[in-house]
Amino acid sequence: MNSWDAGLAGLLVGTMGVSLLSNALVLLCLLHSADIRRQAPALFTLNLTCGNLLCTVVNMPLTLAGVVAQRQPAGDRLCRLAAFLDTFLAANSMLSMAALSIDRWVAVVFPLSYRAKMRLRDAALMVAYTWLHALTFPAAALALSWLGFHQLYASCTLCSRRPDERLRFAVFTGAFHALSFLLSFVVLCCTYLKVLKVARFHCKRIDVITMQTLVLLVDLHPSVRERCLEEQKRRRQRATKKISTFIGTFLVCFAPYVITRLVELFSTVPIGSHWGVLSKCLAYSKAASDPFVYSLLRHQYRKSCKEILNRLLHRRSIHSSGLTGDSHSQNILPVSE
């Protein structure tokens, strides 16, 4: 194993560690907070988090073993199962992000009727469709024997070793990425751009009111006026940064892998194995970044994390004080009469 392979193996280990801890923390927050569970987005987050954890404990270790051993890391049956999960979880992750963007669009564009339009039952139906959509392609690939170990990505994933099936497999792979990656990307762009448009409209209204107030308050201290103007600027940039993060992480993580898969099918130029594994690692890194992008940086999840931490510290302090009291009572000698 050369330095490139060692670096890729280290990247995979780091991604696995961050993904496991962060997604487990999201699950703890969902279990702890009833307020979060009552909201419709909690179902999308739960679906995304469970998929990320499954990918972390099944697919990432097999890819790590493939990088280290430079060969198929498991038997054919286990590899086909891992390839089925890899295809399903990738599509499920993309479609779950599209569902979350639709939820944000409904919340921002229809704030007064959001609870009526996006109930837990509606969210459950969307998750059910996501699963059905994501299961279609790996089920078809399993029936056509297009699941196995792919040396270029050191992973158990979609692959076809028969030259006579090259065209059919290329059409299938193109359709899979069009109806998972491209469809989700279009939904993300349409919904978040609409959200950005509404957010900018509200910012302009707030800015007009703020400027009118500043004009009326002639005796206002210059430092207060400057802070108000700086807050205006931050308000304009906040929505843009969030939406850029949502779409940017989706593209950075998934686009290199999808493009590599398509170039591999339709180009005669050989692709380096290190780039293939790196693009797969980038796709895996979405499982590590999702908890921070969609959950842990939000106020409700931060509050839930603090409550969990305080409860653990409180239990530890009670336990330690109990042990101290027991040891102190044991050290006291009985006084004879």
Curated annotation (Swiss-Prot):
Q: Name one GO biological process term.
A: adenylate cyclase-activating G protein-coupled receptor signaling pathway
Q: What is this protein called?
A: G-protein coupled receptor 26
PROSITE patterns under this entry? G_PROTEIN_RECEP_F1_2
Q: Which residue spans belong to the Cytoplasmic compartment?
A: 32-47, 103-123, 190-245, 298-337
Family, according to the entry, reads as follows: Belongs to the G-protein coupled receptor 1 family.
**TM segments?**
11-31, 48-68, 82-102, 124-144, 169-189, 246-266, 277-297
| Primary localization class, coarse | membrane
Gene Ontology molecular function: G protein-coupled receptor activity
Function, as annotated, reads:
Orphan receptor. Displays a significant level of constitutive activity. Its effect is mediated by G(s)-alpha protein that stimulate adenylate cyclase, resulting in an elevation of intracellular cAMP.
The gene coding this protein: GPR26
Query: What happens after mutating residue 104 to Q/E?
Result: No effect on constitutive activity
- SUPFAM superfamilies named among the record's database cross-references: Family A G protein-coupled receptor-like
What subcellular compartments does it reside in? Cell membrane
Topological domains, Extracellular: 1-10, 69-81, 145-168, 267-276
Keywords in alphabetical order: Cell membrane, Disulfide bond, G-protein coupled receptor, Membrane, Receptor, Transducer, Transmembrane, Transmembrane helix
> Which terms in the GO cellular component ontology are assigned?
plasma membrane
Changing residue 104 to Q: reported impact? No effect on constitutive activity
Q: Which cysteines are joined by disulfide bonds?
A: 79-156
Q: Which domain of life is it from?
A: Eukaryota
Question: From which organism does this entry originate?
Answer: Homo sapiens (Human)
A matching Pfam family: 7tm_1
Give the tissue specificity. Answer: Highly expressed in the CNS, the highest expression is seen in the amygdala, hippocampus and thalamus. Weak expression is detected in testis. Down-regulated in glioblastoma.
Mode of membrane association: Multi-pass membrane protein
